[in-house]
Structures are given as structure tokens and as C-alpha cells.
Amino acid sequence: MTKADAILWAIAFITGCVFSFFQWGWLGVLALGGMLYSGRRWGGKVWLRLPSSQSFAIATLVALLAMAYVWLRTPQPGVNDISGLVPRLEGLNLPSTVLVEGRVETTPLPNRAGRRRFFLGVERYQNLSPVPAQSGVLQGRASGRLYVTLPAAAGAKLHPSQRIQISGRLYLPRGGGSEFFRAFNFRRQLQLQHTFAGLAGNKVTILDQGSPWGLWALRQRIIQVHAQGLGDRYGAVVSAMVLGNRAVAIPFEVRDSFRRVGLSHALAASGFHTAILLAVVLALTRPLPQQWRYGLGAGVLVLFACLSGFAPSAIRAVLMGLAGLVALVNGQKGQPLVILLAIATAMLIYNPLWIEDIGFQLSFLATLGLIVSAQPISDRLDWLPTPLRNLVAVPLAATLWVLPLSLAIFGIFPVYGLLANVLAHLPLVLLTVGGFISAMVGLLVPPVGSALAWLLYYPTAFLLWLIQTIGQWPGATIALGSLGWLQVVVLYGLIVLVWLSPRWRRRWFLLFTLGVTLVLVPFILRQNTLFQATVLANTQVPTLVIQQPAGTVVINGGDSQGLTAFLAQEGINRIDWAVASDRQYRQQQGWRDIHRITPIRQFTDVPTAKSDPAYREMLATLKVPHQSLPLRQPVQLGQVKITVLRADPAILTLEMGNSQWLFVSDPSRDAAQTDWLAVTPVEPPQVLWWWGRKLTPRLFEIVKPRSVILSRNALDPAIATYLKQKQIPYFVVGEAREVRWQADGSLKANAPQNDGLI
């Protein structure tokens, strides 16, 4: 076996892991392997430079084995897994409320809803019911894990190793998102962490305090040291430089600010931090013997990996650093590309499921970019001063290699990302070094560590001011929409062509123009021709996004995170018409955050009788033209016409092209809207979109819809049976996720845009 063979087989193993994303990926592996085998065996002189045809045959086998390995290592629920309780409760028509005992496995951290989230190792369970005779019908021992969310106050005192008892609603996580780019598939992300059910908890009792020691305790002490010296907000940012964002409760507005300017990596445990720490350690220990220097450097890297919670990106960075130290000890010049390939292969052999981790993917692509592209870019920037040349070349090389995948997942391009990376470099270096030193001192003497952390107050304040200022510049981010997998493959093909071919390297601008065209042309065509409507996967606030050439219409904005993510993936940079179906802040609180990311041109609401002060305050801070929709008078934008039939609660007709929808919100417990519709003539709609509490077959008998969309978690079996008997197609948003209407009148469930070619 030659070195070239080993490299080929390592690449084949990684390729097989990637092809496991596709249901028929094994056919792609066979086709690619057969083409390379045939080309090497019967091709011309160019093919003779490659490894032997036998090596390609072995590589094909390695790729197929890698696919099988991924499938075999994919977690599946055990016989006694707690997730099996959900269908048992449904089968007995029992409430989904349960009492669960188990041990806390991860540190509770806040989610965007303000609740604490963590994983619980399950030991026992018991069902609960308002009817005493039904409680305890199902109980016993169980295995597996639960993804638990708790009110912030209830989860504030929890830590790993505690044995607790929680009551709440047991549920199965939803799928959704792209089948290839699986970043937003909640069910899949939990499955990769050996979790198949969730618990929306409301009450917790601590049964056993568990061990007060562990890595979690070290992390908590570091966080407390920084918080005491800098305050919670600034302290969280500095702690993230040491621990990574997976272990620190960074305020979400700070996370979003870093993301908008292309600096998300600064808050993650990555190679940026390990490179700085290793360089500082080696510089400070220069007077010491060589073995001591390299030993201390290796110790700092291992400690960094432990504190970060062994995130895949941190492991990759630490292994690269250790490999570099080994090369220095042996007096050899390392081959970083070969080392990176070996580390990627070894990590995937250890855990092939890391191939789906976003941090793993972006970390390796960024490192690959630094290895192969940073120096050529720096050479072309010879007109800049040398220090500035390197500051520009490094982030530019990393950005070029991660951009196609980043666009495919998030759909956002940070316009000022390169400038932000250059300007923030010095403060980030200072905070990384200062944060690590204050953390290590704080582990031994907390007051001294906090005093050292206080010295970082003004650098932290400057960094946050800089990031927030750049993020507020006009056009700070552009939503280009999620790329299709073929676009991603072609873009990376162009990048590799520039890297490997000297001939095409000289024509890099031509390939750059081709890549930009490949992204922009589909985006422009889509914005000028697309006409579709999407009911988002939100059962708390019914949300609809209508895309048309005349402008984007959005109905309801209670879920800012879900809505802004959808708008970015669809390439929507402006909301032309925002509509609120009520005047309750609880239902419409997301508009402020949405407007900050995606500007709103016109805001209208249904003139409901109730309007709380928080809602009126939100309207005042929006600073957007506002008016109430008139009763029974259509208001139109392009091909979309909205008419308010009833204001309190809202009943709207939505005319989109030749299709008519009827939106019915019924928050009452007595189906009052059905009674109102019974005495009010309404033309039978093509689509009935319903959201509320109580649903009865009488509503369908009165309205006579052709199709039904229900913004709720689940559907009563009796209602489902009725709709099937009447042959009325229906979609339950809690089960189907996104429901999309096309201009031809068709409805489709869970059809992510970037599963297509473009």
C-alpha cells in the first residue's frame, strides 16, 4: 500500500459518510467508483497519474462500507425506551402528562423561549391524569434519554448528576427541514444524541443532589468568575472564548449580532482559539527546555478540549495542534493537508455521526481553506502591508471554503464579514488569552480571577460595540436563500479546480464570476417569478408567508426565530406587508426582532377589541407605517387580497390568484366561531386554515372546504376519521411541519426548498 492509496481510501471513507445522507447514495458511490475505475483502467495518459484501478475498486468498497457503518452506528430506540410510552398513551386515550424520574446529564441552558433545556437519563415513569382512576395506569422502569425543557426558575438550580423527578407533557420530536442539509431537523438532531422523545416540564423535585465535582463544576466556576468580574452579559462572551458557546448561556441577541457579521466562530470552541493559546504558551515558555514547552502546550490544548465539552470542532482543532507539536518535537516539517485528512478520518471512524454536525463540517472546511488557499490569496495581496495582508487572507480563505455550505444551511451572506473579521481580530486575541488566564487563576483563587477578568471590561465593550455597529450598517446581511445540493457541489467543484489546476488558477476571476452567477441567477429568477404560500410549523401562533413578485406578505409574527430562519432560507430580504390577526403582545411579540433583521414596509392588524399595553408599545418602537384593516373591505397587494369578515376573534378570507382561503381563529373553548359562521354566508373556500382550541365536525359541514390546514399539534381521531370519510385532504401542522401552497392550487407538506438541485 502506497501513501497515495491510503489518501485515496481515506477520502473514499469520508465520501461514503457524506453519501449516507442520500437514500440511494450507494448507487451514487457505485456510479462514481465505476467511472473512476474504468477511467484509470482504459483511460488516456492523464489517468495514469492516478492510483491503480485496483485501488479505485478498493476505494469504492471502502465508501460502501462507510455508508453501512454510518447506518449501523445511527442510534435506534431500545425496547424499553421512554419514547415508546407516547403511542401507548395515545392508544389508551390517556393524557400525555407523565411523571419521570432520572438523572440530569447535561448543564441546563436557556433556549430562545426563556426555558431551560437539558438531557435527562430516564429511570422510571408514571402517567398522570386529572381523573384519579387513570393516573398510574402505565408505570414502571424505562431507559433512554429525554430532551427536557423547564421554566427558567424551576431549572435554575439543576446540574449534572442530580437525580430528579419531573412532571410534564411527553411528546415525540418533529422532523422537518432538508433531508440532505439536516441542520434544522429537530428529530434527527436528537436522534444523533440518542434521544427519541421530549418532555415539556412544569414542575421538578430534586431527589438526590448528586456529585458536586466534575467538568461541569469547573465550567460553572469559570462562568461565575467571569460574571463577577464583568457582569453576566460581558462575562458570558469572555467565557465563550474559553468554553465555547455550547457550554455558556450567551444572550441570544449577542449570538445573533456575531452571526450577522460573520463572526460566529469567535464564540465557538475552534482552531482560532487553540492557535492563539498555543502560540502564547510557546512564546511565554521560550526560556524553558523544549520538552517542557511542548508538554505545557499539549496540556493547554487537552484542557481546552475538556472545558469545551469535547465539541467536534474543538477536538479537530486540538488534534491539529497536537500533530503540529509532534512534528516540532521530531524536527520534521508537517504535512498539514495529510494531517487534516487523517484526523477527519480518525474522528469519523470513532463517531461517524459527526459527519452531520455543523461545527464539524464548517471547522474542517475552514481549516482546509486556510491550508490550501490562505497563502495564494496572501501572495495576490502583495500590495498590502504584510501584517494586514495576513489579516485579510486568513478570513477570506476560510470564508470562501465555508460559504457554499453556509448558504445551503442558513441562506445568509454577511456583507461586511471580512471587514468585521479584520477589525475584531485584536480584541478577540486579547479576550481569548485574557479569558483563559483569568479562568485558570479563577479555578484556584476565584477573587483574583475575577479581578483579572475585570481588566477585560473595556476590550469586551469595544468588541460588542464594533459588532453591533457593523451589524446595523445598511445591507449588513443579504438573504440569498438556501442553495440546492447541486449548486453546492458545483461551487465546491469550482473551488477545487482553482486549488488543483494551475491553468484554472490563472483564470480564477472567470470561475469566481461563474460561481456568483450560479448563486444570483436562480435567486433573481425565483424572486421575480415565484408565487407560493407556506404555513409555518408553529402551532402556538398561526403563521403564513406569501411570496409573490409584487412583494412578500406575512401573517402573524409570534415566533421570530422560526420566521426569520425561514425568510433567510427563502431569500426574502424585506416584508412588504405584515399582518397581525390580533392585538395581543403574547401572540405578536416577534415583530420587533423580525423587523431588525428583515425590514417591514407596512404593518396592519385586525381591529380586535383587546389590545394590551405591551402590544401598543411594540407598535411604537417598530417605527413602521401602521393601519388597521377595515371590516369587509378587501385590501390588496399584487395577487393577494385580504378581507376581514370578523375582527374579534379573526376570520379572514385570503384570495391568492384563483384560490380562496378562509382563515378561522377560534381561541374560545366553546367553538364560538362555528356558531358565527353558521349564520353568516361564506363562499366555500378551496382551503380552510384553522387555529384554535376546540374543533368539531360541524365546522366542516358549514364551511364545506376542499382542503383543510390545521395549525395544531395533533388531531382528534374522530375528526380525522370524519375528514377521511368525506374525502377532504387535511394537513396537521404539528405533524406535517410546513404546508406549502403552489400557484396551481396544490398543497404539499414538508417540502424543503433546498432538497432540489437549485
Give each language-model segment a name.
Residues 231-234, 290-296, 427:
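Membrane-interfacial loop-to-helix junctions in multi-pass transporters
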Residues 1-20, 327, 428, 433-468:
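Hydrophobic alpha-helical segments
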Residues 155-156, 160, 167-169, 210-211, ...:
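Non-globular, low-confidence helical/coil segments that flank catalytic cores
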Residues 63-265, 565, 606-610, 627-630, ...:
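Membrane-interface helix/helix-cap signal primarily in integral membrane proteins
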Residues 1-88, 97, 316, 687, ...:
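N-terminal leader/targeting segments
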Residues 25-34, 362-363, 421-426, 484-487:
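Alpha-helical transmembrane segments of polytopic membrane proteins
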Residues 1-6, 211-217, 243-247, 308-314, ...:
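Hydrophobic alpha-helical transmembrane segments
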